[in-house]
Amino acid sequence: MASTDFRPLHDRVVVRRVESEEKTKGGVIIPDTAKEKPQEGEIVAVGSGARDESGKVVPLDVKAGDRILFGKWSGTEVKINGEDLLIMKEADIMGVIG
């Protein structure tokens, strides 16, 4: 998805989940029904930032391309251009990987 297809507002980000492993280290294949949804993703697009008390826009700490960790129940699942993505607030992000 190109970042121009959808632009989140304010302090929201669009995240693509990173696919979880299909096999365990021991070689056991994990069926889709038993897999947990990954809590790791890549930021696809970011909003302009939230406004502080004085009305000034505070830019986000994350940017498109960052790999992040987020909470299990974070965000809202959406389908944009046929791709399953998440929209969440920056506060739902626990940290940036790397």
From Swiss-Prot:
Keywords: Chaperone, Cytoplasm, Plasmid, Stress response. One of its GO terms (biological process) is chaperone cofactor-dependent protein refolding. InterPro entries: Chaperonin_GroES, Chaperonin_GroES_sf, Chaprnonin_Cpn10_CS, GroES-like_sf. One of its GO terms (molecular function) is ATP binding. Signal peptide: none annotated. It comes from the Bacteria. PROSITE patterns: CHAPERONINS_CPN10 (PS00681). The keyword Ribosomal protein does not apply. GO terms for cellular component: cytoplasm. It is found in: Cytoplasm. It holds the Pfam family Cpn10. The keyword Glycoprotein does not apply. SUPFAM superfamilies: GroES-like. Belongs to the GroES chaperonin family. Heptamer of 7 subunits arranged in a ring. Interacts with the chaperonin GroEL. NCBIfam families: PRK00364.1-2, PRK00364.1-5, PRK00364.2-2, PRK00364.2-4, PRK00364.2-5. PANTHER family: 10 KDA HEAT SHOCK PROTEIN, CO-CHAPERONIN GROES. Together with the chaperonin GroEL, plays an essential role in assisting protein folding. The GroEL-GroES system forms a nano-cage that allows encapsulation of the non-native substrate proteins and provides a physical environment optimized to promote and accelerate protein folding. GroES binds to the apical surface of the GroEL ring, thereby capping the opening of the GroEL channel. This is Co-chaperonin GroES 4. It comes from Rhizobium meliloti (strain 1021) (Ensifer meliloti). The gene is groES4.
